[in-house]
Amino acid sequence: MDHHSKAKELLQQRDELDGKIKELMLVLETNNSTMDSPLLDAEGYPLNTIDVYAVRHARHDLICLRNDRAALTEKIVVEMENENKEVSGQTATSEEKPVHRTSNEPFVKISSVVELSPADIGGFRKDDLIIQYGNLHHGNFNDMQEVAQITKQSEDKIIRVTVIRENRPVRLEICPKKWSGPGLLGCNIVPISGANV
């Protein structure tokens, strides 16, 4: 199987995972719950306003599926990069063209992520250090307006992001979109200097 076919197959698998994740998120929303909201009352008894078993089961499955999705995304990126290497003389689209970073030095970080937001679904985690955001990296980054501009221009499109998490690079695909919360991502991105914008 060539790299293009393999990437297409992996994308289909990820779409199936996204469908399952959406169903599990609906279970949490129906029960007015999040990934870490309390399931017990002040006296230690299960809350009678939610389906405690369903919420616990959904949380467990969401953790597993998100890990599976992250692993699939890593494989997809590798296959697409290998495909680009094999195709000579063909102009890659702006979304497919690999960005050549001058270093792996982070320039912004994630200070908070709202649960069930596009950022959360895409795999952003609090304290992730971003070394690539679309075509932005430490070597060409000037200010946070560039991050905001890329996000706005990429509504309902994929932004390829590489973060440092637990001292290793993790590749993600983030899709900014309108959702029930504010903004298109549902996370707070700040400069490494710590100045919030």
From Swiss-Prot:
A Pfam cross-reference name: PDZ_6
InterPro entries per UniProt: Nas2_N, PDZ_6, PDZ_sf, PSMD9
The PDZ domain, residue ranges: 75-166
GO-annotated cellular components: cytoplasm; nucleus
Keywords: Chaperone
Gene Ontology terms describing biological process: proteasome regulatory particle assembly
Family: Belongs to the proteasome subunit p27 family.
Summary of the function given for this chain in its UniProt record: Acts as a chaperone during the assembly of the 26S proteasome, specifically of the base subcomplex of the 19S regulatory complex (RC).
Name by which UniProt lists this protein: Probable 26S proteasome non-ATPase regulatory subunit 9
Gene this protein is translated from: psmd-9
